[in-house]
């Protein structure tokens, strides 16, 4: 059994509440505000102590890079996690990628969305997907020609229109300034992470 100080137990409880209510952990600043610390640095020291005791795991360099081993978050069914930049090799829905939660019902989209992916760049501007938009994504490994997909090639995640002929796949931009990405599945792995089912502009 992990032995925690009262303060550490209080912080761990707050992290659990955030995971249950929002689906993602708090930032250091949010912990400092909730617990009355003068600065996020004080929260960081307590988090390091919790990590040393094995109560949490921390991802360096990520503002929300906190997870509790064995703890399954139950996010609000009327909200979706917003995914920012995806780290190389990490699952898209890894906690360190979640920036915030957006209050929109997943069933608003068809098929229902599993998460919102923040768009970076203008490669899909001609179909109205712009830099900074939130792309609603339905998680699936299957895609048909012509669908807009979230695809992973090596360590890169990209949003493009899907086209396949035999073992050849083309990921097509909707902007003439961007060349198609061609992948031969015999030589290179390509993973479909999901389908675009909508766009939110803030």
Swiss-Prot record:
Gene Ontology process terms (BP): DNA repair; DNA replication; negative regulation of DNA-templated transcription; proteolysis; SOS response
Q: What is its EC number?
A: 3.4.21.88
Spell out the catalytic residues: 123 (for autocatalytic cleavage activity), 160 (for autocatalytic cleavage activity)
Where does the entry annotate site (Cleavage)? Answer: 88-89
**EC top class, as a word:** hydrolase
Question: Keywords of this protein's UniProt record, alphabetized?
Answer: Autocatalytic cleavage, DNA damage, DNA repair, DNA replication, DNA-binding, Hydrolase, Repressor, SOS response, Transcription, Transcription regulation
Q: Which reaction does it catalyse?
A: Hydrolysis of Ala-|-Gly bond in repressor LexA
> Which ranges of the sequence are annotated as binding DNA?
28-48
- UniProt-listed InterPro entries: LexA (IPR006200), LexA-like (IPR039418), LexA/Signal_pep-like_sf (IPR036286), LexA_DNA-bd_dom (IPR006199), LexA_repressor (IPR050077), Peptidase_S24_LexA (IPR006197), Peptidase_S24_S26A/B/C (IPR015927), WH-like_DNA-bd_sf (IPR036388)
User: GO terms for molecular function, please?
Assistant: DNA binding; serine-type endopeptidase activity
One Pfam match, by short name? LexA_DNA_bind
Subunit structure comment from the entry:
Homodimer.
UniProt lists the family membership as follows: Belongs to the peptidase S24 family.
Any idea what job this protein has?
Represses a number of genes involved in the response to DNA damage (SOS response), including recA and lexA. In the presence of single-stranded DNA, RecA interacts with LexA causing an autocatalytic cleavage which disrupts the DNA-binding part of LexA, leading to derepression of the SOS regulon and eventually DNA repair.
Protein name, per record: LexA repressor 1
Q: Which gene encodes it?
A: lexA1
């Amino acid at each position: 059994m992990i032995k925690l100080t009262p303060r550490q137990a209080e912080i761990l409880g707050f992290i659990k509440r955030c995971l249950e209510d929002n689906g993602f952990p708090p930032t250091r600043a949010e912990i400092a505000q909730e617990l009355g610390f003068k600065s996020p640095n004080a929260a960081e020291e307590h988090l390091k102590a919790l990590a040393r005791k094995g109560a949490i795991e921390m991802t360096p360099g990520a503002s929300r890079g906190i997870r509790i081993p064995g703890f399954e978050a139950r996010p609000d069914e009327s909200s979706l996690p917003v995914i920012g930049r995806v780290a190389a090799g990490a699952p898209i829905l890894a906690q360190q990628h979640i920036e915030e939660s957006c209050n929109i019902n997943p069933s608003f989209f068809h098929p229902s969305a599993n998460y919102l992916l923040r768009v970076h760049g203008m490669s899909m501007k001609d179909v109205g997907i712009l830099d900074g938009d939130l792309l609603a994504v339905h998680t699936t490994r299957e895609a048909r020609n012509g669908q807009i997909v979230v695809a992973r090639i090596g360590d890169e995640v990209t949003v493009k229109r899907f086209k396949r002929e035999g073992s050849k796949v083309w990921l097509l931009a909707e902007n003439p300034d961007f060349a198609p990405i061609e992948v031969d599945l015999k030589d290179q792995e390509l993973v479909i992470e999901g389908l675009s089912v909508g766009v939110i502009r803030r």
